[in-house]
Amino acid sequence: MNLVYGVIAEIGSEQGRRTGKVRVGGAIKRISLDLLADPTLGDKVLVCEGVALAKVEDPVM
């Protein structure tokens, strides 16, 4: 399991599911936001296998 830290840059929907673009390092990845209660732009999140698992307050190193 690889956990990465990112910042939500865009929120949308795809096929009835909540998705978003998350800035991870220098890359932008499209991920599922379905597990987050109320995602907003700029939220810091932990991502695993294309799914945002939780919001975080500080980067996890």
Model feature map: region roles:
Residues 1-61:
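Exposed beta-strand/loop interface patches that mediate assembly or binding
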